[in-house]
UniProtKB/Swiss-Prot annotation:
Chain intervals with Basic and acidic residues compositional bias: 39-53, 263-275
Family from the record: Belongs to the peptidase C40 family.
Biased composition range(s): Low complexity: 276-317
Stretches assigned to the NlpC/P60 domain: 321-450
Protein name: Peptidoglycan DL-endopeptidase CwlO
Superkingdom of origin: Bacteria
Amino acid sequence: MKKKVYTFGLASILGTASLFTPFMNNTASAETSQQKQEIQQKRSEVNSGIESKRKEIAKLQDEQKKLEGKIQELDKKALETSNKIEDKEKENKKTKKEVEALKKEIKETEKRIEERSKVIKNRVRSLQENGGSQNYLNVLLGAQSFGDFITRATAVSTIVDADKDLLDEQEKDKNKLEKAMSDLNTKLDEIQKTLADLKTLKSDLDKQLKEQANLSKQLQTKQAAAESELSDLKKEAGSLTKEEAALEQKLKEERAAAAAAAKAKEESATAEKSDSGSSSSSNSGSVSKSDGSSNSGSSSSKKSSSPSRNYSSGSVVSSNGNAIEAAISTGSSIVGRSPYKWGGGRSQADIDNRRFDCSSFVRWAYASAGVELGFGATTSTLVGKGRAVSASEMKRGDLVFFDTYKTNGHVGIYLGNGTFLNDNSSRGVSVDSMSNPYWKKAFNGVVRRVVE
């Protein structure tokens, strides 16, 4: 009898436990599903934020591109104005030399005038000492014949005419001197006015360039902040994706546990019916035994790892002095014959027609000498080539960079003696002086040696 009671009690406990297990599993699954929905909602919001941030960055990049175009135009005008100032200062210097030459000529003219004045004074004094016009009359009356009289009259007339010519020539020299001085003063006034106008224009352009550069920096700061926020949003999206995947795995495990519990319940109910049937059909007092067993499942998780990537920068380009001279010779061969083209030199057609911008010109010149600096090179990539050297140690063949419309916005090949070979928007391919006010202001000591 006790065995029957025990069997019935055990079956009751197992049955009750199996009733509660699916309920508990269903509750847990509902909570997990709710968490998954919340994460999906949050991930949707983050993705929306990512899309919005991408549009913001695209807009900032478009504004930056337009601004760079405006800065390029201002920079071109500033360079042209600087070149005009340089030319006008040369003209001013030449005019000053003309002034010195004219002063010398003036002194010589004054000396001739003084000498002529002395001759006239001496002649007048001689006339006065010898009776003046009476002396001329005595000369005429002393003639021995009519022919002699004519000869003496002609001589007297010649002397008088000579004095008159001296006076006329002296007057002409004075007029010439005054005219030369007047022309010179007019020319100097025009030069000074033009120089003043050019310097005012240059100052205004520099001011505009500074304002645009500040605006460019502000846009760059905004873009950097937006990109940082975008990076954070992407990280958050990645984290939410992992959480969602973990919850999905948890849901699978909970559903598997619920299925196992339901199966256990079914097996328990079947066992209980079997025990009850055996007890009813046995009248001999024999007791049937029942035992149960439970299987526990195990779950395993796999960890995945992603390989890390290592990026390396370009190495120093090295060659020999022959490559430097070959590059300079090639570049110099088109001085004055190659117009500047923004973004040029990056197609075979441009190269064949010698249409470059500053960076593609430098790349082309060195490529012709067997030194490859990278097809499609820009000032941003070239400034990372070779190794940095100080401005005091730069030598022929080094790359020199200038802060024009942006930091390191222009590049050329240093030739030595303060000159460099470059392709600029004002003169195309040309040799320019680093002492030119424009280039002097733009050069901040950035020099790269690409050929040792």
